Amino acid sequence: MFEQTFKNIDDVLWKEAGCTTELDYTEQTSWLLFLKYLDDLEGERALEAELKGESYTFIIDKAHQWSVWAAPKGQDGKLDQNHALTGDDLIDYVNRQLFPYLQGFKQRATSPDTLEYKIGEIFSEIKNRFQSGYSLRDALEYIDELRFRSQQEKHELSHLYEAKIKNMGKARRNGGEYYTPRSLIHAMIQVVKPQIGEKLC
């Protein structure tokens, strides 16, 4: 499921003038996946809190939640075409409202250890490279189909990311230096024999 979605998104990005390398593809796919994952996670946490009779405070304001700007749904559970931004409206929203809002988390966070600070740090370092709101809408719809509930789904996603980073290295592009072959990882673990509670300096 994830593999086909990644291929579909790469096809969309291939048509984008602002995306020319595997690194661009990975970066653009990453910020979209991150926001979708965060929205799903917050939805689960809110549901758990509700079941316990507790309240939950969302990290992301309602107006900037995935389910509002990226994939608003109608009563039938399908994309609400009347409320889904597209074209220039979508690009303007992402560049002028969403990214500045997310970047602002860095200043609003109480400490660097918080998720809020990390969100701000991430979005201070990247740029939306989509120039066509129609292409971005296509990518959003592909990503919205993904679910991150099971360990198997999360495991599949991690393997696909690893493959993308490996491909950047093979193509002599930036990012390949972040790929460590699994055989080397296993060898390092066998030599170091880390134990729970130990720290590496």
Regions found by a protein language model. Give the residues of each.
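Non-catalytic, mostly N-terminal accessory regions of nucleic-acid modification and defense proteins
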Residues: 1-196
